């Protein structure tokens, strides 16, 4: 049985899977409800926050590209006049404020993190020497030689979690990244779920 509030940390791939959706029926909105009810305390690495914002920016850029292509396709098939006349003029809009749109997406995420009273783990919890030791000894998450260098963020996040929670304080880690899970998995006080939904089912 869990002790509440349950400390929960979430990997970037979980936010990606949720597509940063904050509608009333989304897993992230459900997380907010669990926080408000005192069941969950969210603790995130500053690396996860930064990666998530970068992924939001990437999503905004993709959406702008899709809109640009949709505009071009519509104008190949019809005219501006007809498109506006039938009430679909929004598709003709040219996006000129991409940076502003990215900022809005990032602000939405920041507001969400504030709403759920997120504790952010900083770089002060990272011992670069220990991470480099793991890198050269090919310990998790560095065991795959082809992807070794791209695993540094996971190694830093795993170390932040270990330093923050020690060997006794229970923490739930939500991730579907096997290398990251192996990097975190040395402590008995770490509980793993591959999705927010699976955690909710267990609460």
Task: Provide a role label for each language-model segment.
Residues 173:
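Conserved nucleotidyltransferase catalytic core and NTase-mimicking acidic/glycine-rich helix/loop elements
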